[in-house]
């Protein structure tokens, strides 16, 4: 029997058999309203222009490849085609029903979609995370199943640790994966991300910026003279009110007090010479 390459390697590897041609499968014509998308599929954004282009093709040529669904008519493979048929106002479409339980259906749908080359980096990263958390995969097993390197799996999994705002920027191709990786677990990731975007830094410049930030240094971007790093935040965020507050607190406690103010928080620092002076500070605080 001929192999159906159109379904990809995902179904065949997961079902433990070669995917056979659709001529030998049972193809049924189903009302499109009975079919529902898989809520756990990694792709969350579908470009309207591409769906419209596919819808126009379906109107002219019909749906050439059936959609794969489970017993509950939940889509395993073919959501783009289903959406295009909906847009084209097609009432009935050909489907192949796979006899799978809910767990098998969900797993195969995830794997099949992750293997697509047009997922965004974050969609792929979230898919990896979901498989590991819900299907007992390890990074090594996932790499083997998907035919990807362990380092690729590990690097994408770490992107899930980024603040949501940065994940969104990666998803929208405003930040690259290389730039985003530099910001993982950084206290001021969102501030730095905005600076990277506003100053059009490349990955190497981003790496240098983060390195210097941790060293409490500053540098200048190629296109302007603004200082960046911890000193940049402190120098630009400290205003007259904070200076007056520092002066008042220093006089009240009789010691040196400094305030480091950042866009995402700050530090109030009491400087003492010895434990006796520390005791006096604590006494006044109480």
Swiss-Prot record:
The keyword Coiled coil does not apply. GO terms for cellular component: chromosome. One of its GO terms (biological process) is positive regulation of sporulation resulting in formation of a cellular spore. Pfam families: HTH_ParB, ParB_dimer, ParBc. InterPro entries: Chromosome_partition/occlusion, HTH_ParB/Spo0J, ParB/RepB/Spo0J, ParB/Sulfiredoxin_dom, ParB/Sulfiredoxin_sf, ParB_dimer_C. One of its GO terms (molecular function) is DNA binding. Keywords: Chromosome partition, DNA-binding. Gene3D superfamilies: 1.10.10.2830, 3.90.1530.30. CDD domains: SPO0J_N (cd16393). Involved in chromosome partition. Localize to both poles of the predivisional cell following completion of DNA replication. Binds to the DNA origin of replication. Belongs to the ParB family. This is Probable chromosome-partitioning protein ParB. It comes from Rickettsia conorii (strain ATCC VR-613 / Malish 7).
């Amino acid at each position: 029997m001929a192999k159906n390459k159109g379904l990809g390697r995902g179904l065949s590897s997961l079902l433990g058999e070669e995917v056979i041609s659709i001529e030998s499968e049972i193809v049924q014509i189903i009302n499109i309203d009975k079919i529902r998308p898989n809520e756990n599929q990694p792709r969350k954004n579908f470009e309207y222009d591409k769906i419209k282009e596919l819808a126009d093709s379906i109107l002219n040529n019909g749906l050439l490849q059936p959609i794969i669904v489970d017993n509950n008519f939940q889509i395993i493979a073919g959501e783009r085609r289903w959406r295009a048929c909906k847009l084209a106002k097609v009432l009935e479409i050909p489907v192949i029903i796979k006899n799978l339980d809910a767990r098998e259906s969900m797993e195969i749908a995830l794997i099949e979609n992750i293997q697509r080359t047009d997922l965004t980096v974050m969609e792929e990263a979230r898919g990896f995370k979901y498989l590991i958390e819900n299907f007992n995969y390890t990074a090594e097993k996932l790499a083997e199943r998907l035919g990807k390197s362990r380092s690729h799996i590990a690097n994408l999994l770490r992107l899930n640790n980024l603040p949501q705002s940065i994940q969104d920027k990666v998803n929208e191709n405003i930040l690259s994966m290389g730039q985003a990786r530099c910001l993982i677990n950084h206290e001021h990731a969102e501030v730095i991300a905005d600076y990277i975007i506003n100053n059009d830094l490349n990955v190497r410049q981003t790496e240098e910026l983060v390195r210097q930030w941790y060293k409490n240094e500053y540098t200048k971007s190629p296109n302007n003279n603004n200082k960046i790093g911890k000193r940049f935040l402190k120098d630009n965020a400290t205003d007259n009110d904070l200076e007056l507050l520092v002066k008042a607190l220093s006089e009240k406690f009789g010691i040196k007090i400094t305030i480091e103010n950042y866009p995402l928080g700050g530090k109030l620092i009491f400087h003492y010479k010895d434990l006796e002076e520390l005791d006096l500070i604590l006494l006044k605080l109480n």
